[in-house]
Amino acid sequence: LDPNPEVGPRHAQDVRDAIELGALLGVKRVVTMSGLPADEPGGRRPSWTVEPWHSVFLDARDYQWNEVGIPFWKDIQARAADADVKVCIEMHPHNLVYNPATMERLATEINATHVGAEMDPSHLFWQGIDPVLATEHLGGLVYNAAAKDTRINEAAKLNGVLDDRFGRVAPDDPDALSLGGSYTLSRWPESSSWDFVAVGRGHDVDFWTEFLRALAKVDPDMAVNIEHEDQELDQLEGLRSAAETLKAAASRLG
């Protein structure tokens, strides 16, 4: 949905291609985000409104949903239904769908049968959302799950969780992670308000037990995929922490 012609069309085609390829390979679930349009026709950059307390932001949101987001996702729903592939939306800030309410709105607007949620707790924690409650609330709309943790740091007491002290990474920087076109992943703030961490380093086994329990009520066979973005641990250390925590949590289910 990005208005940049070097970014939006390519990402949109990736989603369509993933659905088609999934059907050919017998893969029944593909994961993506919902995307974010500009705030008006002809806009050049995506625009995300945190709280539309001013009516101008409601105008922007109405355009983003009614003119761009809903038509696109109606088409994706039709393609997914034809292919019998479930499209799992990661509820991620800076997208149209970022919490249970926006997930439900999209599902209602497009009469979803093959578009639902990927339950990734990490993006919910820092918004103050309880992933267990969110899973129970969305129920059958949850198609897939990721295991990634978030730690809320002391700095959140000073700057809150809406901390914008990110830095720019040039596209030609050796550490740059391309997000399409000339876009890159921004540099994380020092003394950040929150961090993504390996499973178990933000929330203990008790939480993960209840999270697995809630997922099992939706679908006992649902895969829970470990996702590693902990900058303080290497990949094997992060995988070990996540696996040990999830195994301990699973052992408590009966």
Where are these regions (language model features)?
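Flexible loop residues that form catalytic
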Residues: 35, 150, 229
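Conserved beta-strand positions in the central sheet of alpha/beta enzyme cores
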Residues: 31, 143-146, 225
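A short, acidic, flexible beta-alpha connecting loop/helix-capping segment that sits on the rim
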Residues: 223-238
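C-terminal helical cap(s) of enzyme catalytic domains, especially alpha/beta-barrels
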Residues: 235-253
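Active-site acidic/histidine proton-transfer and metal-coordination neighborhood
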Residues: 1-117, 209, 236
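A structural motif
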Residues: 22, 27, 142, 220-221
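Acidic/histidine-rich catalytic cores of soluble enzymes
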Residues: 59-201, 254
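A short, acidic, amphipathic alpha-helical segment used as a generic capping/interface helix at domain edges
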Residues: 202-217
